[in-house]
C-alpha cells in the first residue's frame, strides 16, 4: 500500500510538472552542427534559431538601445576640450561652457542646510 501511494504521488507530481512547463522543440541543425532550441509557448521570445543566435540578437538589441540613449543626450564635450595639452577654461571657478569674466560656474542656487554649512 505504501509503495503504491508513493508511486502514485510521484507520477502525479511528474504529470503536473510536464503539463505546467512550456513546450520546447529540439532538433538537429545541420548548418550549425549542433542542437537548436526554440520555445513554442506564449512565454517564449519567438527566437527560432540556436541558443547562440537568440542570445546574440538580444545583445545586439541592447547595444543599439544603449547607443540610442547616449546619442539622444544633449550634453557634449567641445572640440576645444578634447585637444591635447589644453585646459578648457583656465579661469578659476568659471564654467567650461561659459568661460568669460564674471560668468557663473554654477548658475542654480541650493537651499541652505546644515550639511551645506552655508552662512546666513
From Swiss-Prot:
Induction: More efficient to mediate cytoplasmic Ca(2+) accumulation when oxidized, but inactive when reduced. It comes from Arabidopsis thaliana (Mouse-ear cress). Its main location: secreted. Expressed in roots and stems. This is Protein RALF-like 1. Keywords: Disulfide bond, Glycoprotein, Hormone, Secreted, Signal. Cell signaling peptide that may regulate plant stress, growth, and development. Mediates a rapid alkalinization of extracellular space by mediating a transient increase in the cytoplasmic Ca(2+) concentration leading to a calcium-dependent signaling events through a cell surface receptor and a concomitant activation of some intracellular mitogen-activated protein kinases. Mostly active in roots. Prevents plant growth (e.g. root and leaf length). Residues 27-71 form a propeptide. Proteolytically cleaved, probably by S1P, a subtilisin-like serine protease (subtilase). One of its GO terms (biological process) is negative regulation of cell growth. The keyword Cell membrane does not apply. Disruption phenotype: Longer roots. GO terms for molecular function: hormone activity.
Amino acid at each position: 500500500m505504501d509503495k503504491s501511494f508513493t508511486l502514485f504521488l510521484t507520477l502525479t507530481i511528474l504529470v503536473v510538472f510536464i503539463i505546467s512547463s512550456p513546450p520546447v522543440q529540439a532538433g538537429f541543425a545541420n548548418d550549425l552542427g549542433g542542437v537548436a532550441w526554440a520555445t513554442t509557448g506564449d512565454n517564449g521570445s519567438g527566437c527560432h534559431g540556436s541558443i547562440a543566435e537568440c542570445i546574440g540578437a538580444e545583445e545586439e538589441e541592447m547595444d543599439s538601445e544603449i547607443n540610442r540613449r547616449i546619442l539622444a543626450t544633449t550634453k557634449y564635450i567641445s572640440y576645444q576640450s578634447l585637444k591635447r595639452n589644453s585646459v578648457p577654461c583656465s579661469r578659476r571657478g568659471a564654467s567650461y561652457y561659459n568661460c568669460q569674466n564674471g560668468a557663473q560656474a554654477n548658475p542654480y542656487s541650493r537651499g541652505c542646510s546644515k550639511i551645506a554649512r552655508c552662512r546666513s
